[in-house]
């Protein structure tokens, strides 16, 4: 009801198809939408695309996560805005992945105390590992983030890595022997496993982007700074995090998500 007072539009509640909690499945005064599938099915941009696509720069959509809604409810009920939230702490440099209740202003040094496998040679990421932001020990988690990832910082390059069998390497295209072995957990680090090269169309971006968008043509229109073409190809429906998997799987080592971010900034500047 509180959210309905904040907007003249429809309030959508997006939940997992397997959700069983009646708090969500029987919520009133909202339109309930169910989603399933691997990442990025849970991204708000992907969900908006399938529920009510943004067709122009004049369309406005506000979104909140469950903890934000709970915070608003507590504020309206008690007059006090909560200063705590629950976050997920994970990554291969974390001793035991866990959920934590933290003070929103807590430093990462306090949060990570006695929880790291090592304190040097690591990258601390506020947000998810694909689209988060690198942080220092004396900084805190970003306001809207609900996770912290810590992974090893790669400082060495592997000579002729593409020619090695890759027993423990992840490969979307199944080009390493690891694809033939039994499934096991892969420990990721910050290595790009190669340098940037020309964009070659293999359809990898489309494989991991569950949106009715042509990512290759959109990226090229952004690089060409063609605003009109960007709008035709759906730039207003895009967000950086929705394309982070495209960056991860790109055989050309192209920062697809970064280009999308630049495209959105360019579209905003041009009005």
What do the PLM-derived regions correspond to, one by one?
Residues 1-271:
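Buried, small/hydrophobic-residue-enriched core segments of structured protein domains
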């Amino acid at each position: 009801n509180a959210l309905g007072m904040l907007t003249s539009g429809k309030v959508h509640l997006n939940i997992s198809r397997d959700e069983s909690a009646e708090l969500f499945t029987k919520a009133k005064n909202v339109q309930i939408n169910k989603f399933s599938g691997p990442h990025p099915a849970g991204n708000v941009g992907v969900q908006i695309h399938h529920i009510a696509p943004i067709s122009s720069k004049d369309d406005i959509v506000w979104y909140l996560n469950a903890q934000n809604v709970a915070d608003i409810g507590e504020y309206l009920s008690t007059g006090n805005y909560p200063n705590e939230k629950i976050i997920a702490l994970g990554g291969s440099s974390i001793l035991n992945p866990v959920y934590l209740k933290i003070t929103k202003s807590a430093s990462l040094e306090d949060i990570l105390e006695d929880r790291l496998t090592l304190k040097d040679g690591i990258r601390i990421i506020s947000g998810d590992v694909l689209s988060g932001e690198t942080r220092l020990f004396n900084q805190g988690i970003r306001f809207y983030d609900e996770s912290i990832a810590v992974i090893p910082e790669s400082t060495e390059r592997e000579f002729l890595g593409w020619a090695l069998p890759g027993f423990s390497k992840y490969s979307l295209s199944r080009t390493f022997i690891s694809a033939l072995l039994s499934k096991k957990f892969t420990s990721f680090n910050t290595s790009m496993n190669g340098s940037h090269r020309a964009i070659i169309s293999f359809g990898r971006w489309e494989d991991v982007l569950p949106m009715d968008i042509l990512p290759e043509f959109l990226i090229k229109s952004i690089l060409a700074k063609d605003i009109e073409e960007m709008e035709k190809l759906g730039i207003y429906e895009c967000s950086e995090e929705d394309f982070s998997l495209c960056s991860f799987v790109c055989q050309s080592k192209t920062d697809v998500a970064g280009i999308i971010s630049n495209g959105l900034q360019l579209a905003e500047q041009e009005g």
